[in-house]
């Protein structure tokens, strides 16, 4: 949840120190909104399994409801006097990354996007016999229509950074493999003459948020 990056010297503080107005939220099933029955060991491997399965049974995927939570956060920011509505950005990390991608695609008020530790693609999950914590990102039959690289492609020309994409086990994916899987997105940005607006990169070990995202924070 948000508490992991909200401590002294964390990502949130670094953003604030660079002059950004930050709204950090725990979407449903994460952090402060996590179910009390989700024990640490179970949660580590299966994530918000109970919430995800309940959501699927009602025909409302958890990832979609989380995207809605993020859009409501954009509503809050847009209504504040100290926020320039033309400069709203979204940063989704780990389990918050996929719903942030959906939210940004559906809400053009989000002008640029950074996704750190996001599952590289749904297709990668199909190819792996073992995966960890993917239930909360599941959409039934999604690959009949699209995959995550297709969503990034549809974000063009808005700037998108993909940092430390992960495989279905949560391990860092090789940058070369990520580049291959996101060829469709790179083509979309290239056709829009904004090739530089899509960046796929690792986060150096020990690198601070400010060091990693200096260009992204300045990008307008």
Language model feature labels by segment:
Residues 1-80, 85, 93, 120-132:
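Cap/lid segment of the alpha/beta-hydrolase catalytic domain
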Residues 89-100:
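Gly/Ala-rich beta-loop-alpha elbow adjacent to hydrolase catalytic centers
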Residues 135, 168, 183-220:
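C-terminal catalytic histidine-bearing segment of alpha/beta-hydrolase fold enzymes
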């Amino acid at each position: 949840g948000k508490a992991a990056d909200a401590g002294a010297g964390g990502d949130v503080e670094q953003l604030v120190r660079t002059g950004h107005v930050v709204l950090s939220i725990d979407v449903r099933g994460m952090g402060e909104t996590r179910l009390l029955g989700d024990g640490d060991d179970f949660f580590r491997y299966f994530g918000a399994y109970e919430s995800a399965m309940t959501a699927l049974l009602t025909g409302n995927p958890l990832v979609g409801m989380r995207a809605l939570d993020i859009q409501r956060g954009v509503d809050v920011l847009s209504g504040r006097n100290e926020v320039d509505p033309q400069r709203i950005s979204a940063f989704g990390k780990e389990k918050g990354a996929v719903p942030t991608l959906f939210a940004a695609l559906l809400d053009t008020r989000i002008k640029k996007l950074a996704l750190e530790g996001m599952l590289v693609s749904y297709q990668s999950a199909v190819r792996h016999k073992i995966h960890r914590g993917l239930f909360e990102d599941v959409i039934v039959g999604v690959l009949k229509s699209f995959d995550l690289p297709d969503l990034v492609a549809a974000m063009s020309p808005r700037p998108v950074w993909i940092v430390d994409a992960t495989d279905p086990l949560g391990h860092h994916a090789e940058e070369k493999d990520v580049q291959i899987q996101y060829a469709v997105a790179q083509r979309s940005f290239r056709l829009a003459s904004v090739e530089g607006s899509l960046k796929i990169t690792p986060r150096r070990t020990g690198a601070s948020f400010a060091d990693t995202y200096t260009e992204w924070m300045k990008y307008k």
